[in-house]
C-alpha cells in the first residue's frame, strides 16, 4: 500500500515540477522575447514603423501645417527686417549689407522649412543608429539560456508535495500578472511612437520661428524635444537590458520561489521605470 502511495506522490511531484518548470520557462522566454521586441520597436524610424501612418502624417504636415508655417515665417522675417532697421539708430544709419543679410537669412529659413521632414528624419536616423548598435550588445549579453534553469529543477525535485503545489499555484497566477505587465510595457513603447508622429506632424511651425532671436526659443525647444524623444528609445533599451540581467541573476540563484517573485518584482520595477522615462521627458521639455 505504501508503495502505491509513494508512486502516486512521485507522479504528482513530477507533474507539479514539470508544470512549474513550464511556467518558469514561459516567464524567462518572455524576458528574451521582450528584450528583442523592444529593441526592434525603439530602434525603428517613424518611416519604417508604419508606412501608412507615416504617409498620412506627412500629407497632413505638408498640406495643412506647412502653409500655416509659411505665413508664420513671413511674419517672423518681416519682424526681423523691422528690428534690423530700427537697431541702426532708427533708420538714420541704413546700410545695403543689412538687406543682403536679411535676404540670406530668409533664403536659409525657407530652405529649412521646405526640408523640414528631411531634417526630422535625420534626427531619428542618428538615434536609430545608436540604438541599433547598443541593441546588438545588449541582446548578446542578456539572453537567458535553458541551461540556467537546470539548477532550479534540481531544487524543485528535492521539495515535498505540499510546497510544490503551492509553488505551482503561485507560478500560474504570476503568469497572468506578467501578461498584464506586458500590456503596460506595450502601451508605453507604442505610445512613444505615437508621440513621435504627433511631434513630426507639427514640425514646420516651430521650424518657422527659428530665424528670429525673440521667437527662436520655440524652435530650439522643439529641437530639444525631438532629440529627447529620439534618444528616449536608448534609455528604454537600457532599462530593459538591466531588467534582463537582473532576471538572469535570479534564475541562476537556484531558488524557485525567489525566482518567481523576483521576476514579478523586477517586472513591476521595469514598468515603473519606463513610465518614469515616458513622463519625465515631456516634463523636462516644458
What are these regions (language model features)?
Residues 1-72:
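Binding/recognition "hotspot" determinant
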Residues 111, 115, 172, 176, ...:
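Hydrophobic alpha-helical segments of membrane proteins
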Residues 275-286:
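Residue-level detector of conserved catalytic or cofactor/ligand-binding positions
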Residues 72-110, 202-216:
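Hydrophobic transmembrane alpha-helix segments characteristic of membrane transport
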Residues 105, 109, 220-240, 244, ...:
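Pore-lining and gate-forming transmembrane alpha-helices of multi-pass membrane transport proteins
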Residues 149-164, 244-264:
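Membrane-interfacial helix-loop-helix connectors in multipass membrane proteins
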Residues 112-145:
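Functional transmembrane-helix hotspots
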Residues 132-174:
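Membrane-interface interhelical connector segments
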Amino acid at each position: 500500500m505504501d508503495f502505491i502511495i509513494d508512486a502516486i506522490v512521485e507522479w504528482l511531484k513530477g507533474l507539479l515540477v514539470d508544470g512549474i518548470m513550464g511556467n518558469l520557462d514561459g516567464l524567462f522566454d518572455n524576458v528574451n522575447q521582450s528584450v528583442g521586441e523592444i529593441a526592434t520597436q525603439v530602434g525603428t524610424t517613424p518611416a519604417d514603423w508604419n508606412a501608412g501612418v507615416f504617409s498620412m502624417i506627412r500629407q497632413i504636415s505638408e498640406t495643412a501645417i506647412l502653409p500655416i508655417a509659411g505665413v508664420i515665417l513671413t511674419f517672423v522675417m518681416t519682424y526681423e527686417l523691422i528690428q534690423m532697421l530700427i537697431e541702426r539708430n532708427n533708420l538714420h544709419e541704413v546700410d545695403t549689407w543689412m538687406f543682403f543679410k536679411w535676404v540670406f537669412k530668409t533664403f536659409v529659413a525657407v530652405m529649412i522649412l521646405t526640408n523640414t521632414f528631411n531634417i526630422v528624419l535625420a534626427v531619428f536616423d542618428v538615434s536609430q543608429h545608436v540604438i541599433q548598435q547598443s541593441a546588438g550588445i545588449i541582446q548578446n549579453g542578456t539572453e537567458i539560456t535553458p541551461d540556467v534553469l537546470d539548477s532550479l529543477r534540481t531544487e524543485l525535485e528535492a521539495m515535498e508535495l505540499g510546497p510544490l503545489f503551492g509553488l505551482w499555484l503561485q507560478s500560474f497566477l504570476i503568469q497572468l500578472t506578467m501578461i498584464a505587465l506586458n500590456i503596460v510595457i506595450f502601451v508605453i513603447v507604442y505610445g512613444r511612437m505615437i508621440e513621435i508622429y504627433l511631434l513630426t506632424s507639427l514640425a514646420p511651425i516651430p521650424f518657422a520661428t527659428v530665424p528670429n532671436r525673440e521667437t527662436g526659443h520655440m524652435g530650439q525647444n522643439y529641437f530639444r524635444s525631438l532629440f529627447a524623444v529620439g534618444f528616449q528609445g536608448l534609455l528604454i533599451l537600457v532599462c530593459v537590458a538591466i531588467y534582463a540581467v537582473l532576471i538572469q541573476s535570479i534564475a541562476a540563484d537556484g531558488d524557485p520561489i525567489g525566482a518567481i517573485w523576483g521576476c514579478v518584482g523586477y517586472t513591476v520595477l521595469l514598468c515603473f521605470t519606463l513610465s518614469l522615462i515616458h513622463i519625465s521627458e515631456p516634463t523636462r521639455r516644458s
